Amino acid sequence: MQRVNMIMAESPGLITICLLGYLLSAECTVFLDHENANKILNRPKRYNSGKLEEFVQGNLERECMEEKCSFEEAREVFENTERTTEFWKQYVDGDQCESNPCLNGGSCKDDINSYECWCPFGFEGKNCELDVTCNIKNGRCEQFCKNSADNKVVCSCTEGYRLAENQKSCEPAVPFPCGRVSVSQTSKLTRAETVFPDVDYVNSTEAETILDNITQSTQSFNDFTRVVGGEDAKPGQFPWQVVLNGKVDAFCGGSIVNEKWIVTAAHCVETGVKITVVAGEHNIEETEHTEQKRNVIRIIPHHNYNAAINKYNHDIALLELDEPLVLNSYVTPICIADKEYTNIFLKFGSGYVSGWGRVFHKGRSALVLQYLRVPLVDRATCLRSTKFTIYNNMFCAGFHEGGRDSCQGDSGGPHVTEVEGTSFLTGIISWGEECAMKGKYGIYTKVSRYVNWIKEKTKLT
């Protein structure tokens, strides 16, 4: 034993070699072989497995989906700052455009905790909710729209109204504003409101030439003092309507412009014939205590009207009353817009006519005020429907199939267009061939041609 100890002390290297040989010859039971080890760690190889990531292109799944990435790591994937920024906006807080917040056709661009709407022409605001041009839906104005110097929408209202708090709607500024039905039992019968379409306001006024200088022999019209197929109006439903009495009662109609003036057809009036105007009328054979009678003290036909040349060209006249009318729910003026808007309103496509005229061709006159909704007829169809001249200051309205029309005794009465609950004068009943005849239409004086003249002559002093 002493000898062994001496050998170990003198030859430590020998001992180490012996131990190493023993270990190498022993069977290893701690580690699995290569094949079995792979069965336990069965993990798919990654895209760049075996390579240094710093030297390969980034992978979106590896960089940002398996674990949260930084902007720089995302930049490695896209290799483009702009594309990385677009991805980053949604990656950080989701897609803010998912709810489609942009209105009126706006395009949404996502941002971090926010979004941006790219608005089409005519709109602005956070969600493109603000109209900035009158060309689109009248700028959301209830009545009139004008573009300011910086191309912003400025709404306005006709006389007797003021802008509401929203700067879009119009509200009454006087007790009985024009064009409004205020009798409670008839307010439910107000005709369907007309909503502004998209309009090209630059070209809204037709490029028409008034044929002022045409000389033409007097034409022989049949029954051209021209509501057939209409309905009984309720008291106060058309408070701007008046009836004219002269040699015979209810020979023509008219509309209240203001307390002192009536507008009617020029062919209705004769110099030297006494005319009485009755406002607030409903049943011409009954006294309903809503009527107001006034005498006409002055007749002003349009300066281009000449019955000797043509009885229905420039067929418009103004009547001055001896005493002002007292405005109330049964006696209310009709609204008159400017030339541009009167023309736009007419193009809405349908209007209402009213009167006490004959209820059928050569038949009896109506006792109760009649009204009828009539569609506008395109000019080409209008011209083809008659052998008589249709001037540019006239328009056609009615039904091709016949059966409904204005008729004798309705002449001078109103053709009105309702705009968001307020009625505007767009025409004056003038003439036609018979009444409600198939293929024939009622012919009306186009008020847009005469609004400046009306307003100039009827100013209240």
Curated annotation (Swiss-Prot):
Name a single GO biological process.
Answer: zymogen activation
How the protein is affected by changing Y305F? Strongly increases enzyme activity with a synthetic peptide substrate
Where does the secretion signal sit in this chain? 1-28
Q: What's the Enzyme Commission number for this chain?
A: 3.4.21.22
User: In which residues is Mg(2+) 1 bound?
Assistant: E61, E66
Q: Where does Mg(2+) 3 bind?
A: E82, E86
| InterPro entries linked to this entry | Coagulation_fac-like_Gla_dom (IPR017857), EGF-like_Ca-bd_dom (IPR001881), EGF-like_dom (IPR000742), EGF-type_Asp/Asn_hydroxyl_site (IPR000152), EGF_Ca-bd_CS (IPR018097), GLA-like_dom_SF (IPR035972), GLA_domain (IPR000294), Pept_S1A_FX (IPR012224)
How changing N328Y affects the protein? In HEMB; moderate; decreased protein abundance; decreased function in blood coagulation
Consequence the record notes for mutating D93G: In HEMB; moderate; Alabama
| Protein's name according to its UniProt entry | Coagulation factor IX
Organism listed in the record: Homo sapiens (Human)
